[in-house]
Amino acid sequence: MRHQQTERQDPSQPLSRQHGTYRQIFHPEQLITGKEDAANNYAWGHYTIGKEFIDLLLDRIRKLADQCTGLQGFLVFHSLGRGTGSDVTSFLMEWLSVNYGKKSKLGFSIYPAPQVSTAMVQPYNSILTTHTTLEHSDCAFMVDNKAIYDICHCNLDIERPTYTNLNRLISQIVSSITASLRFDGALNVDLTEFQTNLVSYLTSTSPWPPMHQSSLQKRYTTSSCWWQRLPMPALSLPTRW
């Protein structure tokens, strides 16, 4: 769980992973950056830019896999609306199925919303990427952009949520999902058990509707947590929208 591979072919986005607060988490050799923008075009990124980088990506992944004593699978974090997260990632997942067919692939997918859309082609990219996700992902956790904005605005009293607020909320969801891998427990001891315990039908890779996992626990603002009493029944009640 400690090895990461990060890819980015879009040079127009800020390189926060290289210069941000958490830059020391990622090894510099595992940060791959391209010089060409896919312009939010799924076909261009999937069939052109993706083919240019696939050998480099697979080589870096192979080196990380060789360092693992027992490779269980892959956790793929990506967005479905723009650039690298949709087109190149879907192409990479196809090759992961070819080279690591027996290894589990868990995807954490950020779905776009009309209220916070930044590109007109996001619906098209999402549909095309979803098809690949259904075919090559063993278990997919969907995160709705609008839902996390509503949680920050309505439940956490954040008037103008920043990317830091959104990422911290998503990190709490990922942390709760992977808790059984990091701590002792009876369920989900390894990645292969996620699909068995969470997916109802073999033809379905998504265990929950968008952001259902985040609704399992009530959220409190940072200002109210000092005086707000947190009884156990309130923590166990789901958040209603």
UniProtKB/Swiss-Prot annotation:
Compositionally biased residues, Basic and acidic residues: 1-10
Residues at which GTP binds: 10, 79, 83-84, 118, 145, 167
KW GTP-binding (keyword) present: yes
UniProt-listed GO biological process terms: microtubule-based process
Location of region: Disordered: 1-20
Comp. bias intervals (Polar residues): 11-20
Entry binding sites for Mg(2+): 10
Superkingdom, taxonomy of origin: Eukaryota
SMART domains named in the record: Tubulin
Keyword Phosphoprotein annotated: no
Family from the record: Belongs to the tubulin family.
Function: Tubulin is the major constituent of microtubules, a cylinder consisting of laterally associated linear protofilaments composed ofalpha- and beta-tubulin heterodimers.
Name this protein carries in UniProt: Tubulin-like protein alpha-4B
